[in-house]
Amino acid sequence: MAKSPRRVAGRRLLLPLLCLFFQGATAILFAIFVRYDQQTDAALWHGGNHSNADNEFYFRYPSFQDVHAMVFVGFGFLMVFLQRYGYSSLGFTFLLGAFALQWATLVQGFLHSFHGGHIHVGMESLINADFCAGAVLISFGAVLGKTGPAQLLLMALLEVALFGLNEFVLLCLLGVRDAGGSMTIHTFGAYFGLVLSRVLYRPHLEKSQHRQGSVYHSDLFAMIGTIFLWIFWPSFNSALTSRGDGQPRTALNTYYSLTASTLSTFALSALVGKDGRLDMVHVQNAALAGGVVVGTASEMMLTPFGALAAGCLAGAISTLGYKFFTPILESKLKIQDTCGVHNLHGMPGVLGALLGALMTGLTTHEAYGDGLQSVFPLIAEGQRSATSQAIYQLFGLSVTLLFASAGGVLGGLLLKLPFLDAPPDSQCYEDQMCWEVPGEHGYEAQEALRVEEPDTEA
Amino acid sequence: MAKSPRRVAGRRLLLPLLCLFFQGATAILFAIFVRYDQQTDAALWHGGNHSNADNEFYFRYPSFQDVHAMVFVGFGFLMVFLQRYGYSSLGFTFLLGAFALQWATLVQGFLHSFHGGHIHVGMESLINADFCAGAVLISFGAVLGKTGPAQLLLMALLEVALFGLNEFVLLCLLGVRDAGGSMTIHTFGAYFGLVLSRVLYRPHLEKSQHRQGSVYHSDLFAMIGTIFLWIFWPSFNSALTSRGDGQPRTALNTYYSLTASTLSTFALSALVGKDGRLDMVHVQNAALAGGVVVGTASEMMLTPFGALAAGCLAGAISTLGYKFFTPILESKLKIQDTCGVHNLHGMPGVLGALLGALMTGLTTHEAYGDGLQSVFPLIAEGQRSATSQAIYQLFGLSVTLLFASAGGVLGGLLLKLPFLDAPPDSQCYEDQMCWEVPGEHGYEAQEALRVEEPDTEA
Amino acid sequence: MAKSPRRVAGRRLLLPLLCLFFQGATAILFAIFVRYDQQTDAALWHGGNHSNADNEFYFRYPSFQDVHAMVFVGFGFLMVFLQRYGYSSLGFTFLLGAFALQWATLVQGFLHSFHGGHIHVGMESLINADFCAGAVLISFGAVLGKTGPAQLLLMALLEVALFGLNEFVLLCLLGVRDAGGSMTIHTFGAYFGLVLSRVLYRPHLEKSQHRQGSVYHSDLFAMIGTIFLWIFWPSFNSALTSRGDGQPRTALNTYYSLTASTLSTFALSALVGKDGRLDMVHVQNAALAGGVVVGTASEMMLTPFGALAAGCLAGAISTLGYKFFTPILESKLKIQDTCGVHNLHGMPGVLGALLGALMTGLTTHEAYGDGLQSVFPLIAEGQRSATSQAIYQLFGLSVTLLFASAGGVLGGLLLKLPFLDAPPDSQCYEDQMCWEVPGEHGYEAQEALRVEEPDTEA
């Protein structure tokens, strides 16, 4: 509890300096490189020959807002389940997310839309940046409660760069399809975070064990996150799929997959629960696995039945993961996975990549007709067979796992830098480390109430 | 408290088996019957001659997402007002809703869009399935806290089938108009639930009375539900009304009606409250009656004034219902209506059906011009006079009340099956029946805190 | 605590009578004056020659729903941070908002769209009414906890009228640009509320000081408000900007500005916090200043860098305002600003107006091309130079400050009317004044638990 004055002074300056330095650096890079794209710039748009209704905005904006809500409301509140870590869960989600959006704009811009010395940003950039922020927040879930904000900012710095690189290799170099990011977002974010958590392994974390669970209200707050993720996931997967049939098909597949993962989660949770009781952790997380598992395949001709089957399987695996695999992960593999991202994003993400490869291999010209061009342009143009595209999909998964693991190791070593002010083992999962905390746990407001009480009794 | 081992074993298997059986059955039926519709299928869409912007998706998707949010966030959190039943309220909303979406897709598909041996699903199917899930959750509100999850799944099984049948009779056979579902959703859902609750009457429910109220925080959670329902209701009523003028008119009428029901709710709540105090129950529920009461009429030329008048009346009746009618309902009619669905959905739903009939009877060619075709095709085509259409509307209300009541009786008898594991009278409104519950009410986390305290004092 | 029976009787009638009178009056005015506009009326729409996709609804509705969510979910929950005032914060937001929407429709209708003896309402009217309700809720933030519902309704009555007038002078008479309302909404709402709070100065407010802070859970509820405001702010600023490039550019600028204000808020909060700790009040509020500061300039060619710079500055100023300026505001200027609206809406609003004037002065034909017409029609048509338009912008700010201050004084005097039942100094920030409050603070539910306990122990 007692801190050296120097350490306190260090912390006082560390976070402000990092924030201001990062903000300053991205602002300078924005000034030099970032410009409005043709849909967003007044002169360029009006120079073109199109009706206002053709603007990308009207095809993407409602989905963008849903994705934005998922990243900040969804991931943010999902992590409020911890009893004394709600400020940090929401606050650091906010901080990491905001930084990731700026930095991802630059990284993705340099790799995807750098023309004539400039990055051109528009609706798609915003959605892509939100996707990247989503991956960062998935990794945050693995190390939640055991890392300080300065560590997390450095994690985001590294992860966004590697995310952009991995995405570039998959989508641009390998021609892999991954509209909803089973690989690029979920698998990458999960294994990056898990490997990082392994490097940061804390053998004496049991000192904070009493804060690692939820309380009644914190579980209700977490359900805000769950439900917003669940309802908006169809927008997440379809935000960048092709206009016309692509967006509704993706949304519809995701919708049905999620209903199935919900049913299988309840079934398995009751089956493995003590006295047949349901477990809130399963409902909060595993019910969402249906969205992850169709991240790659939902834009394909998966069929509504295929969506149900995939969701059902993902919900079951995820629930069993929480029950049986998470404890082993900690005891045997020394991976402390606070939110169970391995169960929600890791395994369902890999499963989603495999499902995507399977659906790709089964692609026929009959099933897609003239729509093949927008889902599998390389097959439609005769450059690849369905089988070879499927092999590329599997190769994309391997590349992702490689990037994520290497990044996690690198990130872990980076975060071990001693001046980054990691919380001690006994102060994990505790908002007081970084926040002024009022009431209920014995602070100002509580004091005031204590002072008041004698008056009432007198 | 003490349970026979056999009962526990039964429960352990009952819910998993039901979930898996239902999921398996719908999956098989999906595999056989459900196909993408022309807007969603790659080959069919690209075979047609249309621009991508014509896809139904761009006219319906934002409204669909709002409806989806209302059903899961809105209805879910609205029921969290009970102090010890938040997990169940949110969890069973999730479970029932997910199952209802799948099952409604099949039932509505067989009745509405079964062509060439297949059900064709697209944006409208998703919205219709959400509407049906909404009706199931209204019924859930009537029996909240007094039923287990297995009972609720069976209720949903029956209710979805009857909902689809009633909807088919009204919209397809009788040619009744009911865009926002004053009859098909609210009246049906409410009276189905109320009659079912009557059949399940518990004379000794006072044993759980101390859990039947709210606590401070649970009321704030419930307000999440209220406000999301309130803001998105314009989308609920307009999600399936005609393109062009139909959607904005419906949304606008609903918007104004809700402002009026809010004002009249506050007025009446303070008027009948102890010492002029406002009651959160009224604000959480009756303020929404304005959305219900224009469910039928909001697509019509109701005029903004008509919307205000209807909303004002609905808010007042609903508030008075909570104050004076709910107690009578329990004491005289033996209907225990946990959420007061009779006040929010029952009476305003019937009132909405009557308002719809009135507006229908007042329809003129002058008021609608060439727009008459899309609101009242049968009148526009000269097959019916306005008066005869109005009589059909009233007949639709009667049919709905009949289906709902018969369904409620049937459902009540079904849910009385002894192996369905209903909670005992003393354990109603209690999450512990079905959930692992941490903290605050004396479980693990609390234990940990107690252990910790001596350390702090030492 | 003891009240005279007459006072209680007065209160019992005051709020109901005000609500019903206001509702009755607006309903009558709606009946006489308000009609559907050409996009919403069946006959008028079908009389025109356009495709359904041209309807304003499809360009504005998704943004409208986001704005609606911001006003009721965002502003509502943001004010739940007070430990014992959650019912009032949410309930009065609801009441004031609903009344403001109706009354603003009339006021703005008379001033902006009164043709042929009628006000014509459609999508834009709904958005404009929501904007006005937003301003009323900003003022509510300044007097939160110190005013009763009857006082607040009268405040809304006056403020909506003056808001409409100020907006009319700026947008219609002076030709000022202010799409996201840095002046018309934020500056106006903040200074109206602050001056009003000054007139209502309570020298003995410390009697309620122990209720003026937050508790752990109330801060989490407030974050619901913060995050929904943050994610949907791009829709707020772009809801009424021009079709085509205008809406995406405005949304994009707002998005980046908010990321920057979030980073600078965290930096400054940690810098000025005790032991380098972060303060939830800053994160809840100052992180949003980026949305306010680009309210005027976001539709202009601000550039992504400009958005970052503006947001960064606004977040920093707002955080420093909470830390250093709010205490002075109370001690020296006798302005008790409950939510710190001066920091979130006042200073960033004025800054936003200045930024707007700067960007206006820098306008060139090259930067906007043919798009100049839709952002600065008077410059495009040659009626004004960029400099003279910039001077008009500054003049608009002065007019706004004048209207707001005069309105605040007038409002303060009005709210001092003794029969309006203001809460006594010792009962401020306390829900019990106006609401039936259960549990946790020693009411019914708590009683029930006490009764139960002996049974358990016996």
Curated annotation (Swiss-Prot), chains A, B, C:
GO MF assignments: ammonium channel activity; ankyrin binding; carbon dioxide transmembrane transporter activity
Sequence segments annotated as region (Interaction with ANK3): 416-424
A matching Pfam family: Ammonium_transp
Any one of the GO CC terms: basolateral plasma membrane
Membrane topology (Extracellular): 35-61, 108-124, 171-178, 241-251, 304, 368-393
Catalyzed reactions: NH4(+)(in) = NH4(+)(out); methylamine(out) = methylamine(in); CO2(out) = CO2(in)
Localization per Swiss-Prot or TrEMBL: Cell membrane; Basolateral cell membrane
SUPFAM superfamilies linked to this entry: Ammonium transporter (SSF111352)
Positions on the Cytoplasmic side per record topology: 1-13, 83-86, 146-149, 202-219, 273-282, 326-346, 415-458
Description of post-translational modifications: N-glycosylated.
Family assignment from sequence similarity: Belongs to the ammonium transporter (TC 2.A.49) family. Rh subfamily.
Function per UniProt: Ammonium transporter involved in the maintenance of acid-base homeostasis. Transports ammonium and its related derivative methylammonium across the basolateral plasma membrane of epithelial cells likely contributing to renal transepithelial ammonia transport and ammonia metabolism. May transport either NH4(+) or NH3 ammonia species predominantly mediating an electrogenic NH4(+) transport. May act as a CO2 channel providing for renal acid secretion.
Name under which the protein is recorded: Ammonium transporter Rh type B
Source species: Oryctolagus cuniculus (Rabbit)
